[in-house]
Swiss-Prot record:
Function: The carbon monoxide dehydrogenase (CODH) oxidizes carbon monoxide coupled, via CooF, to the reduction of a hydrogen cation by a hydrogenase (probably CooH). CooF is required in stoichiometric amounts in vitro for anchoring CODH to the membrane as well as for conveying the electrons to the hydrogenase.
Protein name: Iron-sulfur protein
Gene: cooF
Domain 4Fe-4S ferredoxin-type: 8-36, 87-116, 133-164
Record organism: Rhodospirillum rubrum
Residues the record lists as binding [4Fe-4S] cluster 2: C27, C133, C136, C150
């Protein structure tokens, strides 16, 4: 399994998003149980993305779990199914009771509860299980990829997996360039 680096996030640039939904399809297929897209469709498997392209005021923005440092879902979960580990928010599905508290407190609307059929001791029941972006940890381990499926599928590279510290440095440098550029024409002496 590729090592999970602490403070890794999915960065989405709305200026490059075409709203093609390739990231959603790739996510759904990556979580279809080891199938590729053709197999998943041919087997009529339910495909559920853990991300969503949201269009607001003519701008498309890929949205998914932000892997919050102080994630409200981890505090709201009564069973501890939502937890912080390895620099990300994880859901231990076996402990999830489908109460939807995590859905209600997520500030990004990044968690959904899906009904799953469970067969135990010959009995078939449905139960709700919380689902969210898991940075494709299992998919990356099985495919040898270093980036999540949504990142791999984006034709414009609007979605990238970035180290938060590197992002902060790049943001700081970009803002410094903007400030320096705006001050070039100002000649103020102190």
């Amino acid at each position: 399994m590729p090592p999970i680096k602490e403070n890794v996030i999915i960065y989405a640039n709305p200026d490059h998003c075409l709203s093609c939904h390739s990231c959603e399809l790739a996510c759904a297929v990556a979580h279809s149980g080891g199938h590729d897209m053709i197999e998943a469709i041919a087997a009529n498997l339910p495909l559920h993305a853990r991300n969503k392209v949201v269009s607001v005021d003519g701008t498309a923005m890929p949205m998914q779990c932000r892997q919050c440092e102080d994630a409200p879902c981890t505090f709201a979960c009564p069973t501890g199914a939502c937890r912080q580990a390895d620099g990300q928010v994880q859901i231990v599905e076996q402990h999830c009771i489908g109460c939807k508290l995590c859905v209600m407190v997520c500030p990004f609307g990044a968690i959904t509860v899906r009904s799953e059929t469970v067969v135990e001791q010959g009995a078939c029941t449905n139960r709700g299980v919380a689902k969210k972006c898991d940075l494709c940890v299992d998919w990356r381990a099985s495919t040898g990829k270093t980036a999540p499926a949504c990142v791999e599928a984006c034709p414009t590279k609007a979605i990238r997996m970035v180290d938060l510290d590197a992002y902060r440095i790049a943001l700081r440098e970009a803002r410094a360039r903007e400030i320096a550029k705006s001050h070039r024409h100002m000649r103020v002496q102190f």
